[in-house]
Each structure stands twice: as C-alpha cells, then as structure tokens.
C-alpha cells in the first residue's frame, strides 16, 4: 500500500485552480481530484474556492450571483468555472477508480453535493472534508454512508481528547483526520494513529516535505492520502520509494 494522491484544486501548480483543465492534468498525472465547492444564487453547485472575487475594481460575492452571471465575468486568469456535475461528466470513464475530495463552503453546499453524488452513484468514490463538526454532523444526518473527513484547525499542535472532540468524531463514524504539513507533522501523524484514525496530509508541495511524508511509518501505518499542487513530482518520488 502507498498513500493516495489528490491533486489540490487539480494540478494547481500547473493549471488554473478548480478548472476542468487542472483536474484533467491531475488525473493524467495519476492523482485524484480535490476541489472546493459552493452554491450560486440560483443553487448551482460550482467548483470555486473563495466566497468572493475581484475583477478590476469590482467586488463580487459568489452566492449573490447566478451561474450565468458568474460565467459572463471576464476573470483575469480567463478561467471557466465548472459545475460539479460537469466535472463528473468529464471523468465518467475514470469513475471506477478515481477518487474525489471536496471542501465545502457551507453545509447546504454539502447537502447539494450529496444529492449529486447519489444521482451519479459515486458515494464510495467521494470524500467530503470540513473543519466544522456541526457541518459534518449535519451531513451525517443526511447520509449514513458518506465518507466524511475532519480537517483540523491549523493552530492545533496535539491530537488528544483535550484538543479535539474525538468521541464525537467516532460517534459520527469519521475515520480520517486531515492535517496540514507543518513542522510537527510527524508527531501529529503518530497521535492520529494512536487514537485509531487514518491520517491525510495537505499542503505537501516541496520535495523535502514530500519525502518526509512518504517516509512516515508508525505502528505499521502510513499516511493514507496526500494533497499536493504537483502530483507528478509526488508520484515520481513515491514510485522510487515504494518500488
């Protein structure tokens, strides 16, 4: 076994983040797709990270615009904002093995995502990540089988019952804790394993950090998934390490 690679917002080190081209690049590089999703004013679920954007001197709030209004905007990077459904449609041929990880802006975006997932029979291939336990609890009430991942706040430097509500995570059947790659990442990884959870790590973008995360092994467990802007570089290092 080796860690699963997610292209962070696609292969965002090479393409414009959260676009079909970025997702295609990630898949071509042997990775799954990580994306950020939110709802427009007309309740269309789109892949877009920030709750607002600026073009020139104009400031726009995504939830106050319809899909058509967003697509009519001339983004400085010329991006085309995709619907989540369009992403699934683009990768139908990969649906048996391709994994997705979605960050949701708010709980209703998560609920809309669950509906699309069910309609496309993709529940087992998809994980929904969030930092807010009340959001994950809300989603669990709507789906007993959804794969939910808890991303911890970046200021947390120890994994224990004193710093996290681990009892509630277990009650919600959340099996994965997602952490940022930072100075004490190895200690956090060990504490996550000791508490019976799987570990995902995000923001793994330098070769130094890639090697560090790949080499992490504790009590027979390795990091289960890694998020990176550069899936090709990580994939090559993993091929060399796990051959």
Question: Where are the model-predicted features located?
Answer:
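Metal-dependent phosphodiesterase/phospholipase catalytic core, i.e.
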Residues: 49-156, 172-182, 195
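Short, motif-level signal for alpha-helix interfacial/capping segments enriched in acidic residues
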Residues: 11-28, 111
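C-terminal active-site rim and adjoining tail of enzyme catalytic domains
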Residues: 81, 152, 157-243
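Long, acidic (Asp/Glu-rich), low-complexity accessory segments flanking structured domains
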Residues: 1-13, 76
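Catalytic domains of carbohydrate-active enzymes, especially glycoside hydrolases
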Residues: 22-39, 169-177
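Glycine-rich, proline-tolerant flexible connector loops at the mouths of alpha/beta enzymes
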Residues: 39-52
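Hydrophobic faces of well-ordered beta-strands that scaffold small-molecule active sites
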Residues: 5-7, 33-35, 100-102, 126-128, ...
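The start of beta-strands in P-loop NTPase/AAA+ ATPase cores
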Residues: 3, 27-31, 44, 98, ...
């Amino acid at each position: 076994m080796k860690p699963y690679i997610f292209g962070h917002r696609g292969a965002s080190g090479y393409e414009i983040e959260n676009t079909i081209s970025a997702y295609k690049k990630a898949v071509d590089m042997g990775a799954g797709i990580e994306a950020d999703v939110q709802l427009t004013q007309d309740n269309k679920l789109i892949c877009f990270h920030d709750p607002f954007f600026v073009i020139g001197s104009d400031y726009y709030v995504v939830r106050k615009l319809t899909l058509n209004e967003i697509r009519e905007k001339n983004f400085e990077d010329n991006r085309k904002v995709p619907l989540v459904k369009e992403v699934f449609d683009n990768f139908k041929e990969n649906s048996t093995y391709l994994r997705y990880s979605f960050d949701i802006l708010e709980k209703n975006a998560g609920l809309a995502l669950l509906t699309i997932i069910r309609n496309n029979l993709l529940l087992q291939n998809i994980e929904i990540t969030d930092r807010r336990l009340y959001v994950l609890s809300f989603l669990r009430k709507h789906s007993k089988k959804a794969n939910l991942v808890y991303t911890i706040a970046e200021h947390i430097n120890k994994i224990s019952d004193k710093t996290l509500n681990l009892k509630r995570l277990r009650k919600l059947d959340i099996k994965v804790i997602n952490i940022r790659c930072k100075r004490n990442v190895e200690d956090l990884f060990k504490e996550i394993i000791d508490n019976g959870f799987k570990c995902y790590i995000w923001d793994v973008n330098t070769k130094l950090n890639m090697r560090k995360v790949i080499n992490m092994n504790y009590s027979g467990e390795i990091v289960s998934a890694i998020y990176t802007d550069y899936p090709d570089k990580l994939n090559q290092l993993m091929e060399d390490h796990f051959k």
